[in-house]
Regions:
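Internal anion-binding site segments
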Residues: 180-182, 188-253
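Catalytic core of DAGKc-family lipid kinases
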Residues: 10, 33-34, 82-86, 90-194
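ATP/NTP phosphate-donor binding region
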Residues: 1-64, 297, 307-319, 332-345
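ATP/nucleoside-binding phosphotransfer catalytic cores, i.e., glycine-rich phosphate-binding loops
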Residues: 20, 221-345
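Short hydrophobic-aromatic micro-motifs
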Residues: 131-137, 186-195, 200-201, 218-221, ...
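N-terminal glycine-rich "phosphate-gripper" loop used for MgATP/nucleotide binding
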Residues: 66-70
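Short glycine/serine/threonine-rich phosphate/pyrophosphate-binding segments
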Residues: 49, 71-76, 97
Length: 345
């Protein structure tokens, strides 16, 4: 007879936008009792999920499942790194970035049912100034918006977009010195993101080609842009074509050091904190075990034909806009020359 695995569900009643009232009953109905001895724990305060997960890993529990959003997932996951305890995810948050990257079903019943397959693999995770992250970490506008989002009374993509639209055109880009094993360069940037996984959440793909199994992070540097550029950037973000945007510079590295003029905000998996002017980021290869979807281990990150068509459409609009701007500049130059000649008559 196969020995049962021990599994603990850590449920955050307050995370995200999805009600979790029925989750305990669904766990009881769906989880295979011949395979698992099941326990359900509820978080009571910030950081409680990390404490519970650490305790369960020390007790030798086989799987700890985070039931909540990206914040809950990060709390649980960071307590399981470099242990034999695997992370499971039942996504109930407003973004669900890691769950989406790993193709965990967004339907709660299906996500719980997937656990019965018990397929586990090892993945990379990142560390920024000592804080583990599993999807992305960022500085600049992204971190600033994360602070605003955390302060907002409401959650969800609408609140996030409202903050982006309200603050985006007022935000002043910073200058950063970015160093990796190839040397150091200075950038004036709207934001800098380091991606272990492909997306922020809500299928917003900041690094469409990122994988959690290559031992490297995708670094995305977004240059300052105008209001006319914003629609193209937004389209690329959701169409998995961000890497094609002229305002984006990308590269891959194992370690990164970033210097800025003063301390400021960063975020790791959407959780904002204030930190020093000096920022260190690195990847820990194969440092966490995660329960995965047996039908799809990671999001391939490649746009389909429809998304490519939309991207081409927006790019064509962008090209027309740039032509108009160039023509407008030429007309302004011609007008100045004519004006100078007329004043001499």
């Amino acid at each position: 007879m196969t020995k049962k695995r021990k599994i603990t569900f850590i449920l955050n009643p307050k995370s995200g936008t999805t009600s979790k009232a029925e989750v305990p009953a669904l766990i009881g109905q769906i989880i295979d009792k011949d395979l698992f001895d099941t326990e359900i724990c509820f978080t009571e305060y910030r950081g409680h999920a990390a404490e519970i997960a650490k305790q369960k890993a020390e007790e030798g529990v086989d799987i700890v499942v985070a039931v909540g959003g990206d914040g809950t997932v990060n709390e649980v996951a960071r307590s399981l790194v470099h242990t034999n305890t695997a992370l499971g995810i039942v996504p109930c948050g407003s973004g669900n970035g890691l769950a989406r990257h790993l193709c965990v079903p967004m339907d709660i019943k299906k996500a719980i049912g997937m656990i019965n397959s018990c397929k586990i693999d090892s993945f990379d995770y990142g560390v920024i100034n000592g804080m583990p992250f599993f999807c992305t970490c960022c500085m600049g506008f992204d971190a600033f918006i994360s602070l605003k989002f955390a302060e907002a009374g409401k959650r969800g993509p609408i609140t996030y977009v409202e903050n982006v639209l309200k603050e985006g055109l007022k935000y002043k880009p910073e200058t950063y010195e970015v160093s990796d094993d190839t040397g150091a360069k200075k950038y004036k940037a709207f934001l800098i993101a380091c991606a272990n996984a492909s997306q922020y959440g809500n299928n917003a793909y900041i690094a469409p080609g990122a994988t959690m199994k290559d031992g490297e992070m995708d670094v995305i540097i977004m240059e300052p842009f105008t209001a006319l550029d914003a629609p193209q950037i937004a389209a690329d973000l959701f169409m998995k074509t961000m890497h094609n945007n002229s305002k984006i510079k990308t590269f891959r590295t194992k370690t990164l050091h970033i210097s800025r003029k003063q301390p400021g905000a960063i975020h790791y998996d959407g959780d904002p904190i204030m930190t020093d002017a000096e920022i260190d980021v690195h990847i820990e290869p194969q440092g966490i075990k995660i329960l995965i979807n047996p039908e799809a281990e990671e999001d391939a990150g490649q746009p389909n034909a429809v998304l490519n068509a939309f991207s081409d459409f927006f790019n064509n609009i962008n090209n027309v806009r740039e032509d108009i701007e160039r023509q407008g500049h030429r007309i302004q130059v011609i007008n100045k020359v004519l004006l100078r000649k007329l004043t001499k008559l």
